[in-house]
Design a protein with these regions (language model features):
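Nucleotide-activated sugar donor-binding and catalytic core shared by glycosyltransferases
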Residues: 1-288
Length: 288
C-alpha cells in the first residue's frame, strides 16, 4: 500500500481509472487508509466476505465488491485428486515453515526440535515437510540436519495432502488459508524481529494474527486453532499443541467444523471470473 497509494494518486490525477485488487488489510491496521482508497479508486475488490461487511459498517461499501478468493478454485482442482490417509495406527504431521528463506531460518529449527520432542514421546507420527519451490534445498538440509532422513519432503500441490493428514504446523500467512481450505487442525507459529513484533503490537487492531482464525471467528474473537507467537513459539509448546489435537478427537473435530464454516468467507469457485467481470463493470462506469 505504501507504494500503491502514491501511484494511485498520480494515476487518478491523470484520469486513469483505478481499481484496488485486493483491498489492503485496513481492518487490521491503519484503518484511515480506507477513506483514501474510496476517494482514489473506482472500486475495491475484496477476497474475504467480512471485508465487505467492514466497509459497509463504515459507510464506504457502495463501491466495494466481494469477489472471493482464487485459492478456492485451486483447492477444488487439487482436492478432486485425493491423497491416501496414513496407514492404520499412524498419524501424519505436516510442516509448512514458510516460503521465504528468512522464514525458514527462523521457523524450521523450531519445527525440527518440536518433531524431535514428539518422536521421543510417541512412535506413531509420520512427518511431511512441504517445501516451497522458492526455498533452496540446501537451506532446508542445512537446518534440518539428521531429521531430514526421517521426513518426507514434498513440493508443488499439497492441499489434498493436508486434507488427508492429522495436524499441520504452519507459518502465519496465506498458508493458514490453505489449511482452512483443507479443514485440517493446525498450530500456527509466528516469529519476526523483535522491533517488528513490537511495532506490530502497537499498530495491529485485531485479536488474532492467523487468517484461519480471523475467517473462522464466530464473532467473539476466540481462536479456532492455537497461535504461538514470538516467545510462546517454543519446541515444547508446539509439541504440546500438536499432541492436544492428536489425543483429543473432539477438539480436532471442533476445529475442523469451525474451519469448514470459515471457508464460506472465501466464496464459491469462480473468483477469477467474478474479478474480471467486476473490473469490466467498473471500467464501464458501474461505479464512480
Amino acid at each position: 500500500p505504501d507504494f500503491h497509494l502514491p501511484l494511485a494518486r498520480r494515476l487518478a490525477r491523470a484520469g486513469v481509472p483505478v481499481v484496488f485488487y485486493v483491498s489492503p488489510q485496513v481492518w487490521a491496521w491503519r484503518s484511515g487508509r480506507a477513506k483514501t482508497l474510496s476517494r482514489l479508486g473506482r472500486g475495491i475488490l475484496t477476497l474475504f466476505r467480512f471485508e465487505k461487511r467492514w466497509y459497509d459498517a463504515r459507510g464506504l461499501g457502495s463501491h466495494v465488491t466481494w469477489v472471493g478468493h482464487p485459492l478456492v478454485d485451486e483447492a477444488a482442482r487439487e482436492l478432486a485428486v485425493p491423497v491416501a490417509r496414513p496407514q492404520e495406527g499412524r498419524r501424519r504431521l505436516v510442516l509448512m515453515p514458510g516460503s521465504r528463506p528468512g522464514e525458514i531460518r527462523k521457523l524450521l529449527p523450531l519445527l525440527r526440535d518440536a518433531t524431535a520432542i514428539l518422536s521421543s514421546r510417541r512412535s506413531d507420527i509420520d512427518v511431511v515437510l512441504v517445501k516451497a519451490e522458492s526455498v533452496p534445498e540446501e537451506l532446508v538440509a542445512e537446518i534440518a540436519g539428521d531429521a531430514l532422513s526421517r521426513w518426507t519432503i514434498v513440493s508443488g500441490p499439497h492441499l489434498a495432502l493436508l486434507a488427508a493428514s492429522d495436524v499441520l504446523v504452519v507459518a502465519s500467512g496465506t498458508a493458514t488459508v490453505e489449511g482452512l481450505l483443507a479443514e485440517i487442525p493446525m498450530v500456527v507459529v509466528y516469529r519476526v524481529a523483535t522491533l517488528s513484533y513490537l511495532l506490530g503490537k502497537l499498530l495491529v487492531k485485531v485479536p488474532n494474527v492467523a487468517m484461519a482464525n480471523i475467517l473462522s471467528d464466530p464473532g467473539d474473537g476466540s481462536q479456532t486453532v492455537p497461535e504461538l507467537i514470538q516467545g510462546a513459539a517454543t519446541p515444547e509448546r508446539v509439541a504440546e499443541e500438536v499432541e492436544r489435537f492428536l489425543d483429543d478427537p473432539a477438539r480436532a473435530a471442533e476445529a475442523r467444523r469451525r474451519l469448514a464454516l470459515g471457508r464460506e468467507e472465501l466464496g464459491a469457485p469462480g473468483a477469477p471470473d467474478r474479478t474480471a467481470d467486476a473490473i469490466l463493470d467498473l471500467l464501464r462506469g458501474g461505479a464512480r
